[in-house]
Amino acid sequence: MKIKETYKTKEKIMNNSLTEEQVKVLNMSQSVINEVRKVIIGKDEIIIKVLLSILAGGHILIEDIPGVGKTTLAVALSKALSLDYKRLQFTPDVLPTDVTGFTILNKETHKFEYKQGAALTNLFLADEINRTSSKTQSALLEVMEEGKVTVDGITHKMPDPYIVIATQNPVGSIGTQMLPESQMDRFIVRLTMGYPNLESEVAMLKSKQNLVPVDNVRPVVSAEDILQARKVVENIYVSDQVFQYIVMLANATRNNEYIKLGLSPRGTIALLRMTKATALLKGRDYVIPDDVIYSLSLIHISEPTRQAEI
């Protein structure tokens, strides 16, 4: 998918009935892609998919081997989007309190003080989430769902926007365990970056020689811009026929002998949000069935059954 590039002038805006706010989101998205592609070479499609997820208000799961640029992607996004960023390596000894935070007694004031966990930031990279304990995984996924943490009876809200990019090693790698479906359902998409092609890897090597670090990524969008963009996406028009089409597709995944677990109602809502974001980045203020099909290909759906694998 490519972002629609015909909506760059006011004349074309009027001809295609996009509002100024919608055009601003289009131009903002293109600016973010231009910055991130400085360090993530040859992966524009992945950048767009992650951007769609952010506009749809979802969290992202990236499954891939180490070294393909997952951390670099998260850092570059945080810089381009002007977001605070934290990373936590989910080793087996990571505790839930490392994620959510804890209270500690201040010996000088004799009062308990809250020490923030790693998850309390705008963009949180949960690295190798399938290498840690189920209890620690649950702590993070609860934060993702609720948008807040409660420690010793006191609730602390996540900053807004709040985005989690979690990575996991391929199933079967040493020291890993599969995330339960109930936890996978918290992610709006499940992506794989893959190896770069020949031309992209050569360009990457040349850029490393010329010392083009992530620090060269410029902030082009503010946190407030992201929140406003989400409101614009929410207002994209969806007809009754498309609503019915979304539910029909969801039901098709639930009654498919080749899929272990179909799209949940929460997944259907996520599909609607992704569909709206897709329509806007394609240059429309309304959704068509093709947007639904494209978005459904990104939304996380359960693993195939054994029969499907055969």
Label each residue range with its predicted role:
Residues 216-268:
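Conserved AAA+ ATPase small/helical "lid" subdomain
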Residues 221, 243-244, 284-298:
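Conserved C-terminal helix/linker of AAA+ ATPases
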Residues 55-91:
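Walker A/P-loop
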Residues 49, 106-125:
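Conserved alpha-helical scaffold flanking the Walker A/P-loop in AAA+ ATPase domains
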Residues 299-310:
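Single conserved hydrophobic/aromatic residue that forms the stacking wall/gate
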Residues 106-111, 132, 136, 144-221, ...:
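Canonical AAA+ ATPase core
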Residues 127-128, 139:
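Walker B catalytic acidic pair
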Residues 26-60, 65:
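Pre-Walker A (pre-P-loop) alpha-helix and adjacent loop at the N terminus of AAA/AAA+ ATPase modules
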